[in-house]
């Protein structure tokens, strides 16, 4: 089993990719417009979330993941790609017309003030082009991971497709639900 998860074997990770953003600041006053705190942001940290985090953790453990997911054609999608490339995660992210799923947290001191989520339920298109790309990426992988964070990438149809693919090719299948 140890050699299965060594760096020489590729692991296909399919699922919901998310950008997690943490804005750290300090509250110094209440807004005159509404009874809410005004947070002065001092530091911003962006991290990989969802299936992107799963793949990144594999890299940290000296594994070789191949990440497949969807991002929007927006700044958060670009930031996700930049983070993945910086961390050394092989990624094949399809751009679509939905916004990139992101979770932006505002933190003052040790208290999270609010979380702002940008997401739209999407259904991954089971088109022949996408399936051909998945087939090609899975070819050299010994393990398939389905990472479902409930954002729409993982549907019944794609789950069934990947389960049958793993079964028919003798690959190990791991399911990572939220």
Where are these regions (language model features)?
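Ribokinase/PfkB-type carbohydrate-kinase core domain
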Residues: 1-28, 43-50, 55-178
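Flexible glycine/proline-rich, aromatic-decorated loop/lid segments
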Residues: 30-33
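Divalent-cation-assisted or electrostatically stabilized phosphate/pyrophosphate-binding catalytic cores
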Residues: 35-42
């Amino acid at each position: 089993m140890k050699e299965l998860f060594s760096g020489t074997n590729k692991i296909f990770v399919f699922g919901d990719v998310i950008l997690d953003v943490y804005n750290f600041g300090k509250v110094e006053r209440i807004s005159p417009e509404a009874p809410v705190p005004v947070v002065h942001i001092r530091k911003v940290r962006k991290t990989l979330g969802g299936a992107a985090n799963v793949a990144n953790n594999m890299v940290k453990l000296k594994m070789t993941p191949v990440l497949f997911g969807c991002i929007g054609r927006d700044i958060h999608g670009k930031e996700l790609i930049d983070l993945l490339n910086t961390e050394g995660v092989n990624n094949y992210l399809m751009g679509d017309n939905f916004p990139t799923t992101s979770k932006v947290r505002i933190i003052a001191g040790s208290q999270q003030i609010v979380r702002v989520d940008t997401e739209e339920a999407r259904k991954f298109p089971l088109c022949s082009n996408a399936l051909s790309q998945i087939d090609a990426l899975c070819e050299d992988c010994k393990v398939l991971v389905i990472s479902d964070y409930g954002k729409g990438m993982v549907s019944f149809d794609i789950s069934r497709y990947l389960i049958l693919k793993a079964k028919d090719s003798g690959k190990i299948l791991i399911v990572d639900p939220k």
